Every structure is written in C-alpha cells, then in structure tokens.
C-alpha cells in the first residue's frame, strides 16, 4: 500500500544519472539551436537548465561536496553541501537577473536584444560558469544572510505565483470546455461529456485522497494531520457551495463545479503531499517506514518536485494573469489603406498585436497566432520567414518577467533543499522537502489557494461594477 500511495506523491527512478549526463552534453549545442527558434522551445530550454541546476544542487547536498575549493568553501565542521546549493542557485539566479535587466522593454523580436533571449546559448552558458566561479569566491557568511533575507521571501512569492496560476488555469479550463459546449457544433457533445467526466473524476479523486489520508496519516497522536485534513475537507465543501450559489452565479454566470473541482483536487493533493513530506518522529508517516520504496520514492519525489517547479516557472511568464493586459475594447485589424506609409514589418506587427489581444480576450483561438495568412507582406530582410518562429512580429511573453520568476524559482529550490532534514531521513540521497516546514508550506498553500479561488468567485457579487464577464478571464 505504501508503494502505491508514494507514486503520485513522489516521482523518477534510477535513470536520473544517465539522463542527466545526456542532457548536460547536448543542452548548449544542437538542442538549443533547434528549439530556440520558437518561444515555447526557448522556455523549455530555460526550464531544462533550471532542472539540471537543481539536480546538481541536490546531488552536491546529498554527497556533502563542494564543487570548487572545498578547503575554503566548507565550514570547519565539514559542512559543504548547504553552501554549494546556495552558490549554484545564486549563480543561476544572478544570470536571470542580468537577463531581466538587459531585456527590459523588449516587445518585438526586431529589437536586437531579443536575440539574447532566444539564442546566444553558448555565451549565456559561459556567463553562467563565470558566475559559478564568482559565487565560490564569496564568503559563506554572505549566503547565510542571503538565504534569510532574500531566498525565503523570494520562495514565498514563487509559491504564490504557482497558486495564482492554478486558479487561473481552473477558470481557463472550464471556460474552454463551456465555450465548446455552447457553440453547438459537431464536437459540443464530446466537450460536454469531457466537462462532466472531468469534474466528476476530480471530485471523486478528492474524496478518495481524503479517505486515504484519514486511514494512513490521521492516527490518534497525529493532531497536525487530523487538523489539516479536516480543514481541507471543510474548505472543499465551502468552495463547492459557493460555486453553485444562485447569487454567485447571477453575478458570475461562468462560475460552476468544474473550477471548484480542479481547485479541490489540487489542494487535497497538496494536503496529502504534506502528510507524506513530514518526518516520522511521531509515527504519523508510514511511507517513511516502507524501506522497500524509500530510496525510490525519494528519487522519484525529488525529480517530480524539480519538474513541477520548472513547469510553473515556464508557464507563469506567458500566462495572461501576469501580463497586466487591458482586455477591454473591440478588436479591429484594419486594412492596407489605414497602414499606408508603414513598412511591411510595422504593418504586420500592428496586425499581430491586434490578433494577440483577441487571443488573450478569448475572441480567437491561440492557433490564430500561428496562422500567417494575416501577414500582408514578407519582411524585405527575410527575418520573419522562419515558419518555426512564433514571435515573428512580437514577443509572446514578457522577457523581463520571465527571468524574474526564474530567479524566484532558484531561491525557492535553494530553501527547499537546505531546510534541515532529520538525521534518520538521511541516506544515499537526501529527501527533498521532508520537513515539518515544507509540510506546513504545502498545507498553508492549499488554504491560500482556496482563498484565492473563493475571492475570484465572490468578488463579482460583491463588486459587480468592477467586473465585466463578457470580457473577464
């Protein structure tokens, strides 16, 4: 039973070493050049970079090794791993801050600085290596100060970003399904079944996880677990009732069970993950005592954690919830007479911005951004002729915001890895996040997520003048 439960809570196996070596050798060469031609490829490369940096940090901390100058960078008691983790993530974080500053204000790929975002991978990797060397020159005392006053607040902000993404995605998913159902085309019945099945499945999964938590983690002496599971169950019921309340739906017709089901299943999973992340000093975590799955679950869970952080980081900057775009007003592409006197690139860029605004409002599908039929003329320089480039006339996301969020992610990883782990949990690999601190982070994060979703549901009823649901979401 422990093995079955540990799989969704933890994630990846003994293939980490071989996969890690292969990724390192190709990251800055062929893969970078082939993927870097599209905005998605670029974001994936940065995510892989973050993942590899996290894995190196984890292995260094587990082995308690320093990459450079161990005689100077380790403490008198032989502690090396803590400072190695902070140095590696400090170096990568500084790289992203430098890129954020350099790329400030870039809104078009015609800007020469845009090339730094989507190419020049060798140069960025060399700069990263230089920053690593520099980070090992800085004394250990600096990282103690930095971790307390920069890494911890940055990690908290990153967690909040992830929660906002989840709530936004819940609304986006439900809205997509409902729009297809209301279109009454040949696929509307499929989308209706998909919406009903998805909602039912997520509520069922929430109930199953709640029962499992009460059975496995809520013994008589486990007051923390009992409280966390009970509060989560109460909040699930509250969000369910709110989402179908007649007054709420009158103010927000798009509110429903679909959004609340996704929030409920995610928050219930977070709570269950918190149970499995706590130490077993009070005999409340049977997964730790399952020796047959212990090392596998540690490796699997650590890799899954890093992948989840990389995904959150990559998705955040391209998400409309963080763009601050005003989505009010009609969309009009204009004609060639209105664009007369403008160059081909300028004309195409104006049209692209109009289509991009329509996509953000939901008036057009995202595929419209990849349709080149709206291009009036090709670039005289041929710079926009690359069919794999989805940023031919404008950036798809805020480059500066993208790198700021990556900086926040590096600091959260540093804190996540270096929070104290009890000695009985230490083996060949240190478990990532097996502390009461991380358990409470997950539990409180679930509560905040419920609060964020509850506000998005209640706010239109409280302040109807500030919400226009024809253009909301």
Swiss-Prot record:
Membrane topology (Vacuolar): 30-38, 105-118, 168-194, 247-295, 422-435
Cytoplasmic side: 1-6, 62-81, 139-144, 218-228, 319-398, 459-473
Coiled-coil region list: none
Xref: InterPro entries: TDE1/TMS (IPR005016)
Signal peptide: none
Classification via Pfam families: Serinc (PF03348)
Sorted UniProt keywords: Membrane, Transmembrane, Transmembrane helix
Recorded family membership: Belongs to the TDE1 family.
Subcellular location(s) per record: Membrane
Membrane topology classification: Multi-pass membrane protein
Protein name: Membrane protein TMS1
Transmembrane segment boundaries: 7-29, 39-61, 82-104, 119-138, 145-167, 195-217, 229-246, 296-318, 399-421, 436-458
Native organism: Saccharomyces cerevisiae (strain ATCC 204508 / S288c)
Entry GO CC: endosome; fungal-type vacuole membrane; membrane; membrane raft
Transmembrane helix recorded as keyword: yes
């Amino acid at each position: 039973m422990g093995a079955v439960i540990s799989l969704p809570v933890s994630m990846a196996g003994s293939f980490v070493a071989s996969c890690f070596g292969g990724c390192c050798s190709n990251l800055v060469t062929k893969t970078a050049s082939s993927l870097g031609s599209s905005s998605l490829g670029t974001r994936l490369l940065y995510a892989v970079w973050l993942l590899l940096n996290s894995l190196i940090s984890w292995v260094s901390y587990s082995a308690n090794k320093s990459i450079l100058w161990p005689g100077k960078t380790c403490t008198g008691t032989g502690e090396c791993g803590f400072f190695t983790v902070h140095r590696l993530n400090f170096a990568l974080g500084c790289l992203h801050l430098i890129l954020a500053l350099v790329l400030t204000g870039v809104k078009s790929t015609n800007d020469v600085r845009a090339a730094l975002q989507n190419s020049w991978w060798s140069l960025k990797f060399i700069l990263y290596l230089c920053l690593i060397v520099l980070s090992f020159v800085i004394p250990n005392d600096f990282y103690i100060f930095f971790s307390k006053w920069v890494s911890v607040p940055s990690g908290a902000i990153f967690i909040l970003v992830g929660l906002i993404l989840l709530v936004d995605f819940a609304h986006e998913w439900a809205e997509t399904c409902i729009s297809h159902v209301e279109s009454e085309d040949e696929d509307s019945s499929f989308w209706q079944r998909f919406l009903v099945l998805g909602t039912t499945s997520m509520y069922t999964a929430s109930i199953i996880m709640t029962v499992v938590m009460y059975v496995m983690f809520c013994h008589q002496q486990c007051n923390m677990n009992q409280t966390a599971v009970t509060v989560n169950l109460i909040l699930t019921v509250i969000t369910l009732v709110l989402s179908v309340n007649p007054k709420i739906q009158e103010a927000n017709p798009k509110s429903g069970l679909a959004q609340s089901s996704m929030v409920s299943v995610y928050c219930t999973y977070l709570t269950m993950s918190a149970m499995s992340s706590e130490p077993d000093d009070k005999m409340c975590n049977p997964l730790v005592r399952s020796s047959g799955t212990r090392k596998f679950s540690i490796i699997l869970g650590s890799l899954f954690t890093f992948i989840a952080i990389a995904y959150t980081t990559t998705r955040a900057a391209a998400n409309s919830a963080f763009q601050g775009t005003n989505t009010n007003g009609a969309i009009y592409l204009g004609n060639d007479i209105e664009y007369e006197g403008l160059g081909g690139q300028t004309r195409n860029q104006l049209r692209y911005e109009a289509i991009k605004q329509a996509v953000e409002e939901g008036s057009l599908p995202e595929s419209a951004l990849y349709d080149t039929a709206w291009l009036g003329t090709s670039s005289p320089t041929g710079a926009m002729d690359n069919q794999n480039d989805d940023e031919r006339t404008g950036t798809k996301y805020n480059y500066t915001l993208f790198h700021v969020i990556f900086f926040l992610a590096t600091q959260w990883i540093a804190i996540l890895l270096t929070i104290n782990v009890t000695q009985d949990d230490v083996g060949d690999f240190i478990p990532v996040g097996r502390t009461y601190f991380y358990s409470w982070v997950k539990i409180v994060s679930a509560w905040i997520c419920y609060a964020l979703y509850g506000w998005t549901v209640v706010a239109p009823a409280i302040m109807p003048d500030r919400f226009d649901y024809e253009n909301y979401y």
